[in-house]
From Swiss-Prot:
Catalytic activity field: Exonucleolytic cleavage in either 5'- to 3'- or 3'- to 5'-direction to yield nucleoside 5'-phosphates
Organism: Rhizobium meliloti (strain 1021) (Ensifer meliloti)
GO molecular function, one term: nucleic acid binding
Protein name as it appears in the record: Exodeoxyribonuclease 7 large subunit
Family: Belongs to the XseA family.
Function: Bidirectionally degrades single-stranded DNA into large acid-insoluble oligonucleotides, which are then degraded further into small acid-soluble oligonucleotides.
Length: 526
């Protein structure tokens, strides 16, 4: 018998499968929270995924909800989400049945008031300032007259037109525009790439390297200018090797790139004015400097002329300057004749001293000595030949004796010895003949020198040698006294003579004058 309590009664509660229940919850949640606005702090943000979607969470002090921003929505955001930023997200809540999770799909995102953004900017500013990126010592002066200006901005806005127009009015230079987006997704990356790209240009390349950079954007809200507060952009501006001018927004708009730039311009037009000077002002200044230089040069020339006149008046006259040199010249000219006479006398005395060493008896003795040397050499040569002949005869005798013992073996040696003796004899005769020729040549040369230095050659030219009674040559007129017996030697003989008084000579027949054009036979002693 079955108990009443053991039987199962049907329940009034509907039964669902897990999928049905999850789908019902999903529909209920999406219908109830189809459009919501949620305030919270971004947590776990790591930037967009490789697919372009962004995943993070919104949290407050007691709860947390996952959030997703699809790729198309992320591209339309006015600013990039950042970790710790308080935002207001607008979207719809949905669930994910596979893991029983719910999340908000964000359609728009905005900062939760300007105060939150300013607090984030201040926190980032303190961090970068602590690293020294905003130090005044890092900032470089702008070039006075750049040749190339690089501009990083949007190519379609009014900003680039204002910059180009202002540069053309002030000082036309070469402007290179690097087109970028200045707002929205990817704007920060493009501006950073432009700054780094300009710095990567090499001087002298196909694209000229700018001398100064301008990063410019027009005015806008804090959200519109948010990319210029990006940490990567601030670091790129601080690391730029090219001086950089920031011109973001209006004069009251300040971004972090303004603190890292070398100069901050209140407007893009002001940046163009900072980059290039006014050409007309430079020309006027140059003309003023040229006029001042011309006046200074004229005054300097006048001063120099006055100084030159004063110095000229203080200088002595030309006659005074030349008086002493003229006197020295006259004295030198007067002493020139005396100097020539003294020099001639000195040369004559030197000649007489040297002539004394060329006496005939010395040359004769030298020739005799050379002849004796030649005879000695001839005798030595004859003895040498005689000894060689004797030694050859001895060798022949020895060879003859040996030949008797060994005729067949020594016949060749005898012939060779005989040839060697003959060769030695010929060589000895040739050597003796060569020595005799050389000695005869030297003796002939000495004889020619003796003949040239002999006084007979002088007598041959028409001169006479005067000797006293002892036969000694008379060298000076002072050694001759009246009545002194003299001997006059000519080239063809000698005659006796007596010296007259006071140097007068006995009368001689008048010599017939030489015919005109007939050369005289009288030679010159010198």
């Amino acid at each position: 018998m079955t108990s009443f309590f053991d039987s199962e009664s049907p329940s009034n509660v509907a039964e669902y499968s897990v999928s049905e229940l999850s789908g019902s919850i999903k529909r209920t949640v999406e219908q109830a929270f189809e459009h919501v606005r949620v305030r919270g702090e971004i947590s776990g943000y790591r930037g967009p995924h490789s697919s372009g979607h962004a995943y993070f969470a919104l949290k407050d002090d007691r709860a947390r909800i996952d959030a997703v921003v699809w790729k198309t929505t992320f591209a339309r955001l006015k600013f990039r989400p950042e970790e710790g930023m308080e935002v207001i997200a607008t979207g719809r809540v949905t669930t994910f049945p596979g893991s029983s999770k719910y999340q908000i799909v964000i359609d728009s995102l905005e900062p939760a008031g300007a105060g939150a953004l300013m607090a984030l900017i201040e926190e980032r500013k303190r961090k970068l300032a602590a690293e020294g990126l905003f130090d005044a010592g890092r900032k470089r002066p702008l070039p006075f007259m750049p040749r190339v200006v690089g501009v990083v901005t949007s190519p379609t806005g009014a900003v680039i037109r204002d910059i180009l127009h202002r540069i053309a009015d002030r000082f036309p230079v070469h402007v290179i525009v690097w087109p970028v987006r200045v707002q929205g997704d990817g704007a920060c990356e493009e501006i950073v790439a432009a700054i780094e790209g300009f710095n990567a240009l090499q001087p002298g390349g196909s694209i000229p390297r700018p001398d100064v950079l301008i990063v410019a954007r027009g005015g806008g809200s804090l959200e519109d200018l948010w990319c210029f507060n990006d940490e990567a952009m601030v670091r790129a501006a601080a690391a730029s090797a090219i001086p950089l001018i920031s011109a973001v927004g209006h004069e009251t708009d300040w971004t972090l790139i303004d603190h890292a730039a070398d100069q901050r311009a209140p407007t893009p037009t002001g940046a163009a004015e900072m980059a290039v000077p006014v050409k007309a002002d430079l020309e006027a200044q140059l003309a003023s400097l040229a006029a001042r230089l011309k006046g200074a040069a004229a005054r300097q020339m006048d001063n120099r002329r006055q100084t030159l006149r004063s110095l000229a008046r203080a200088l002595p006259s030309l006659d005074q300057l030349l008086a002493l040199p003229r006197r020295r010249f006259d004295e030198a000219a007067a002493g020139l004749g005396r100097g020539l006479q003294m020099n001639t006398a000195n040369k004559r005395r030197s000649f007489e001293r040297n002539a004394a060493h060329l006496r005939p008896e010395l040359l004769t003795a030298r020739i005799v000595d050379r002849r004796q040397r030649v005879l000695d050499a001839v005798n030595r040569a004859e003895r040498i030949v005689e000894r060689k002949v004797q030694r050859g005869a001895q060798r022949i005798s020895s060879a003859d004796a040996s030949l008797r013992v060994l005729p067949s073996r020594l016949i060749g040696q005898i012939h060779r010895a005989s040839d060697r003796v003959s060769s030695l004899g010929r060589r000895g005769d040739a050597a003796i003949a060569a020595d005799l020729r050389r000695m005869k040549s030297a003796l002939a040369a000495q004889d020619r020198v003796l003949q040239s230095l002999s006084y007979h050659s002088v007598l041959q030219r028409g001169f006479a040698l005067v000797r006293d009674a002892a036969g000694e040559p008379v060298k000076q007129a002072a050694a001759v006294h009246p009545g002194m017996a003299l001997s006059l030697e000519f080239a063809d003989g000698r005659i006796a003579a007596v010296a007259g008084e006071d140097g007068t000579a006995p009368q001689s027949p008048k010599k017939r004058p030489a015919r005109s054009g007939e050369p005289t036979k009288q030679g010159s002693l010198f």
